[in-house]
Each structure stands twice: as structure tokens, then as C-alpha cells.
């Protein structure tokens, strides 16, 4: 299921995509689940199926897509997490990948422009895979880790390489 957060006519909502249509379940669940983040913490498949038949539909072409989770608690990124990228950057081998943060206000929606500081001469952008955690935990065994994943998303990443230190 492709879940999305979007705006239409200045109003934010969320839903799921089916071909070229979004089923706007946010309109149906707004009183208890005002955004997608609050929905994925619950038994969201059951909630979606219970409201899908009566939810309004909107054309995908009539909305502006936003980041799926517009208000994340944390954005934890992993740098140098695969060997070919490490070699490409000329970095030495490391035992553990580098972790760094992003902030919610640095996210952009589909088709939005990325912000580049005028002071940078080495702005780099690339597509990344975002893993959206639906339920937290501590010291989760590897064989149980995917039980905590709510979904995946494409993610725009912009880096000011001349300021980067890792």
C-alpha cells in the first residue's frame, strides 16, 4: 500500500494511492488520527480498511505531495552505509557507519526545490531510501526488527559536502 501525505487547496491530509487516485482517509479519521504519523502507530491496516469505502477520492494530479511523515520525532541518517559509496568518496574503511541527523523542516515534498546555502560550492543531492519506524523498541533482536517498520519511502537528500566532516 502506498501511503501519502498531501495538500489540496491549502488543506493537508493523507491517504493511499491506487493508480492515479488518492483515497483521502485523513478526512475520515482526522478526529482521532490528525496525521499519518498518528495513524501508523495504531493498527493502521484495520483503520484504513474500515474507512476506505466511504472516504473521498482525489486525483493524484490535483495534489501537492509532501514528505509522508511531516512531523517526525527523529530523522536518523546513516552515512557511508555501503562499500561502493565509501570508495566513491575516498573515505577510509570504518567498522561502523556514520550516523547523523536531519531535521523535520529540512524535508521537501515532490517537485519542491532544495535549498543550497550561498556559501557552499559543493552541494550534492541524491535519492535515498527512508525507513519509517512504526513502533519503537529497545535492543530489538535482528529477527524482529522488521516488525517495527511501518513502511519505506523515497527521500531527497541534499548535502553540503564542503562543510561535511565524517
Task: Enumerate the language-model features and the residues they cover.
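Glycine-enriched loop-and-adjacent helix/strand subsegments that border the catalytic/binding cleft
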Residues: 72-166
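N-terminal non-catalytic cap/leader segment that marks the start of a structured domain
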Residues: 1-97
